[in-house]
Regions:
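Bacterial Sec-dependent N-terminal signal peptides
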Residues: 1-13
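Short S/T/G/P-rich N-terminal loop/turn motif that feeds into the first structured element of a domain
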Residues: 10-222
Length: 222
């Protein structure tokens, strides 16, 4: 999970996510369909993205994510056409083998640069015993590792509806591509002391799964 926008009231920033399996060879058609429907959209906040799953534990091939602040989700009223979302889904169904799971949640912290500039994202699904303690430890390690991370974005948030068994929260880390992500992991090894402190103070956390996604099409609020 990750955001294509940043807002000061992070607790009010939300996402809604729908997984699906695309028909073979239909990825470009899906991206073009999204461009046709959302390329010139004026969103109240947030936006919409189409993403492809890469490495990891997810069984689906792609997903759609709708972002927005509570009370400001979707297109501006004057930019809205009747049954627009339904029409988009109807056309999208021609390129999809099956729809999968869905979930929704919130962003609790976002640091770094633009996710559009770092579209290769690794997402860690978490089970937290003490979310408050984890956020404190997370915020600290983010600051401690800022020098080597540079402008690459990192976010922390919750699953409030769905998300999976034994999963409550998530962390997302942006990179430019696969090689950049692996290089960042190697650089993180120099923070052995800091990560040991994070582990001791995070309130108890496990990582049931992790995976990567690649942004195929992004239509943020402008």
């Amino acid at each position: 999970m990750f955001a294509i926008w940043v807002n000061s009231s992070l607790a009010q920033n939300t996402f809604q996510l729908w997984n699906f399996n695309a028909k073979p060879g239909m990825e470009d058609a899906i991206s073009q369909l999204a461009e046709n429907h959302w390329g010139n959209a004026k969103f109240k906040s947030g936006g919409i993205q189409v993403e492809r799953y890469g490495h990891g534990d997810e069984p689906w091939s792609h997903r759609i994510i709708l972002f927005g602040e509570v009370g400001k989700i979707g297109r501006e009223e004057e930019d809205t056409k009747e049954f627009e979302w339904e029409l988009f889904i109807q056309k999208l169904n021609h390129f999809i083998e099956e729809w999968g799971s869905s979930c929704a949640g919130r962003f609790m912290s976002i640091e770094g640069g633009s996710w559009v500039d770092f579209p290769y994202v690794q997402i860690y699904n978490l089970k937290l015993n003490d979310p408050t303690a984890f956020k404190s430890a997370h915020d600290k390690i983010v600051k401690q590792t800022a020098k080597t991370r540079g402008e690459r974005p990192i976010a922390f948030g919750s699953y409030d509806i769905g998300g999976g068994e034994n999963i409550s929260h998530w962390v997302a880390v942006g990179s430019s591509d696969f090689s950049d992500r692996i290089s960042q992991m190697a650089l993180n090894e120099q923070y052995e002391k800091e990560w040991a402190e994070w582990s001791e103070n995070n309130g108890g956390a496990s990582i049931p799964s992790n995976y990567t996604i690649q942004v195929l099409a992004a239509f943020p609020n402008k």
